[in-house]
């Protein structure tokens, strides 16, 4: 086991603070509408230009082990805020730096770090409660667009396209961000349910131009096992042929004789059918087949529930207005399912989301809700160069997370104003303990730091602006983008309450841990001897 370097007290705390400052100073320059760019070197390809706080934070590793520990702890603030709210990473980093810097002064002066932390926690709890009180719901497309624009560094086009996407697929809908092919941002909306399985044979294609198989008013057969014997399918195929309608077969797999017969029937025009594999794997496949059954008004034919393929009737089949099957995707448009049953299914999946523990499971369940409830929107980000594309995509993803957070918990005045107004909750907060009161004072000063940084990045004088904003009331603040004072909500400068709350809570949590740190342990790097040069090899004299 390698030897360890163990250090105590103020000296090691100072190293930790140095690490915090290096990381925070790199991140804080990106804050606000006039935030600067940070250029990050990549091992391969061109440099990455970004204004996204968490992207900058993730790139930083420091040489000194103790400084690096401080930097990594603040990186955790940015990452955690990003995971919970999807935005506000720079605000969280600025708050953490401010709380640590203020708190260290008190610790060095001999105050009890544990009481300071208790005071900080009490102040943050009061601020969070006040933020909930001053938040207003975010319902209209205009407000959603404003939140998106602010988060995307005042890019109004990004806000507008996100608002349009939410309008089309609903607030529960799935919105994904992809690389575009043109210079402009584009919105592509898939109505109905889409899953990532395509036709099993290209001979099913009937629209050569689009390279898809399009079925109008089809029946949908759902089976949870493989189909390889055509005899099992014949009774259903005969009933569908009599009805003179096309058929989509969704099964674990369709192979051999069964697939060949379907293809031949399709080519000869006897019966228009398309076969696709069922989406997902294992239990998720069963659940998704059930979703499709409810959406189309059919049942999943499964031996588990006593149904067999040869005894299936038209009543067991689902129906839809139109189904389009491509090479990799199948889209079911306007299923004939009962609206009440679909709603009940959505409610059931939402219940599962509440109890799900892993982010992956939550994401997959959320996708299922979206496919049943609305649809899927894809924002294709356009840019002139690949470097610009990456930077723009970062901002669009930030904006998307911010708008979702705004819909969830409402919005507050942006530009650091909400935190200043929430300070009112601390005026009457007395803990009855001098050290804890000092903790409250630390937070009281720290909540000014986001506004100060926004003003500094815009080239203004922070103290002058903070004093002027404090003289006002309500949503009165400073719009760094235009250099004007006024009502932030009316000017469209909004922040999601969830983002502001998460930033404050995570910053205070990590900063509190740092203040109560008294010992740090790091590995001592071993001095490995250099590898000796290779000696000359016999018989290679002519090459030396």
UniProtKB/Swiss-Prot annotation:
GO terms for biological process: protein refolding. It is found in: Cytoplasm. Together with its co-chaperonin GroES, plays an essential role in assisting protein folding. The GroEL-GroES system forms a nano-cage that allows encapsulation of the non-native substrate proteins and provides a physical environment optimized to promote and accelerate protein folding. GO terms for molecular function: ATP binding; ATP-dependent protein folding chaperone; isomerase activity; unfolded protein binding. Pfam families: Cpn60_TCP1. It comes from Neisseria meningitidis serogroup C (strain 053442). One of its GO terms (cellular component) is cytoplasm. This is Chaperonin GroEL. PROSITE patterns: CHAPERONINS_CPN60. Its EC number is 5.6.1.7. Forms a cylinder of 14 subunits composed of two heptameric rings stacked back-to-back. Interacts with the co-chaperonin GroES. ATP binds at residues 30-33, 51, 87-91, 415, 495. HAMAP family: CH60 (MF_00600). Keywords: ATP-binding, Chaperone, Cytoplasm, Isomerase, Nucleotide-binding.
């Amino acid at each position: 086991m390698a030897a360890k370097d163990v250090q105590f007290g103020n000296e090691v705390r100072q190293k930790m603070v140095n690490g915090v400052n290096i990381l925070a100073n790199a991140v804080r320059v990106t804050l606000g509408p006039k935030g600067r760019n940070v250029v990050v070197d990549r091992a391969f390809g061109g440099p990455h230009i970004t204004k996204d706080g968490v992207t900058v934070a993730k790139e930083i590793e420091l040489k000194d082990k103790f400084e690096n520990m401080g930097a990594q702890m603040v990186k955790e603030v940015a990452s955690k805020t990003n995971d919970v709210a999807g935005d506000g990473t720079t605000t969280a980093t600025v708050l953490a730096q401010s709380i640590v810097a203020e708190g260290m002064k008190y610790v060095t002066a001999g105050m009890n770090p544990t009481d300071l932390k208790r005071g900080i926690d009490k102040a943050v709890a009061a601020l969070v409660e006040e933020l909930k009180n001053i938040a207003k719901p975010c319902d209209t497309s205009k407000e959603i667009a404003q939140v998106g624009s602010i988060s995307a560094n005042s890019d109004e086009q990004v806000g507008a396209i996100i608002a349009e996407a939410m309008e089309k697929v609903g607030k529960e809908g799935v919105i994904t961000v992809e690389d575009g092919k043109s210079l402009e941002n584009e919105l592509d909306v898939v109505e109905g349910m889409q899953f990532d399985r395509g036709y099993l044979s290209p001979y099913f294609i009937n629209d050569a131009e689009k390279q898809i198989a399009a079925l109008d008013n089809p029946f949908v057969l759902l089976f949870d096992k493989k189909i390889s014997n055509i005899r099992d399918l014949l009774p259903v195929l005969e009933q569908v042929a009599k009805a003179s309608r096309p058929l989509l077969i969704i099964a674990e797999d369709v192979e051999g004789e069964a697939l060949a017969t379907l293809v031949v029937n399709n080519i000869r025009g006897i019966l228009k059918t398309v076969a696709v594999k069922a989406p997902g794997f294992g239990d998720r496949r069963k659940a998704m087949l059930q979703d499709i059954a409810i959406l189309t008004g059919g049942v999943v034919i499964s031996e588990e529930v006593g149904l067999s393929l040869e005894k299936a009737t038209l009543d067991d089949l689902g129906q839809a207005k139109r189904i389009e099957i491509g090479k990799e995707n199948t889209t079911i448009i306007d299923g004939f399912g009962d609206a009440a049953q679909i709603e009940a299914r959505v409610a059931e999946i939402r219940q599962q989301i509440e109890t799900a523990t892993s982010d992956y499971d939550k994401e997959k369940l959320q996708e299922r809700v979206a496919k049943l409830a609305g649809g899927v929107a894809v924002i294709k980000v356009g840019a002139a160069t690949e470097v610009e594309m990456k930077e723009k995509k970062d901002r669009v993803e930030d904006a998307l997370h911010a708008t979702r957070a705004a819909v969830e918990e409402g919005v507050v005045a942006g530009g650091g104003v909400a935190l200043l107004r929430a300070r009112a909750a601390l005026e009457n907060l007395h803990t009855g303990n001098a050290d804890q009161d000092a903790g409250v004072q630390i937070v009281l000063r720290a909540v000014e730091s986001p506004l100060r940084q926004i003003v500094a990045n815009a080239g203004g004088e922070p103290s002058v602006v903070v004093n002027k904003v404090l003289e006002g009331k309500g949503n009165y603040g400073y719009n760094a983008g235009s250099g004007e004072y006024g009502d932030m909500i009316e000017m469209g400068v909004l922040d999601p309450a969830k983002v502001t709350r998460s930033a404050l809570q995570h910053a205070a949590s990590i900063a509190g841990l740092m203040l109560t740190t008294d010992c740090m342990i790091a590995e001592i790097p071993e001095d490995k001897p250099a590898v000796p040069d290779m000696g000359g090899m016999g018989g290679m004299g002519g090459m030396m």
